[in-house]
Amino acid sequence: MSNEFSLNAEKRDVQGKGASRRLRRVDGKVPGIIYGGETAPVAISVSHNQLSHALQNEAFYSHILTLDVEGTNESVILKDLQRHPYKPIIMHADFLRVQKDQKLHVNVPLHFINEDKCEGVRQGGGSISHQQTEVEVICLPANLPEFIEVDMTSVQVEQILHLSDLKLPEGVELAELTKGSDHDLPVVAVHKPKGAKADEAEGEGEAE
């Protein structure tokens, strides 16, 4: 993984809604928690500006992060993020400890490549419809991908790519597919324009 992310954090001794509100309003910090593994959960706070800046990078959401908690480094992933419903404020952040020998369940983004070369669009006049923009993967920390590529070059009109069609890095599996074949969800499709379908139906009616 090419990107590296590190955040500074401080331990929180005082907790509760009032204390969290003061952290955000007065100190410009985001309350959070580190949990998981055999170590007890730790209540922390991180800089709102630093976290907001990091969140602008898509890779931050699917990357192993380093939290420097008053001089002690913790390897974590961002597990949950609570935002204000209408203000650009991060309310709370949950970080899950990472252990190199334990598999992670992480959502990673899909990158659709070569859409401009898609045969179903260039030759068939179709349009691309995305059903999924991210997928949940299961893997060891060392195998965690920042994203999964979906090559659209050879996708034809009325063709649908499912989860089982995705090319995964070694050591990575899709959480949905572990639940059975009925969870092989559609990811992306190339459809004919509605007008073209109507014209075809009309032509078939005249031929009869």
UniProtKB/Swiss-Prot annotation:
> Which Gene3D superfamilies does this one have?
Ribosomal protein L25, beta domain, Ribosomal Protein L25, Chain P
**Pfam name, any one:** Ribosomal_TL5_C
Q: Which UniProt keywords apply?
A: Ribonucleoprotein, Ribosomal protein, RNA-binding, rRNA-binding
Q: Which domain of life is it from?
A: Bacteria
- Cellular component terms per the entry's GO annotation: cytosolic large ribosomal subunit
Residues annotated as region Disordered? 1-21
Q: Which InterPro entries match?
A: Rbsml_bL25/Gln-tRNA_synth_N, Ribosomal_bL25/Gln-tRNA_synth, Ribosomal_bL25_b-dom, Ribosomal_bL25_C, Ribosomal_bL25_long, Ribosomal_bL25_short, Ribosomal_L25_dom, Ribosomal_uL5_bac-type
Q: Name one GO molecular function term.
A: structural constituent of ribosome
NCBIfam families assigned: bL25_bact_ctc, PRK05618.1-2, PRK05618.1-5, PRK05943.1
How does it associate, per the subunit comment?
Part of the 50S ribosomal subunit; part of the 5S rRNA/L5/L18/L25 subcomplex. Contacts the 5S rRNA. Binds to the 5S rRNA independently of L5 and L18.
Function noted in UniProt: This is one of the proteins that binds to the 5S RNA in the ribosome where it forms part of the central protuberance.
Q: Which family does it belong to?
A: Belongs to the bacterial ribosomal protein bL25 family. CTC subfamily.
Annotated protein name in UniProt: Large ribosomal subunit protein bL25
Taxonomic lineage: Bacteria, Pseudomonadati, Pseudomonadota, Gammaproteobacteria, Oceanospirillales
Q: Which gene encodes it?
A: rplY
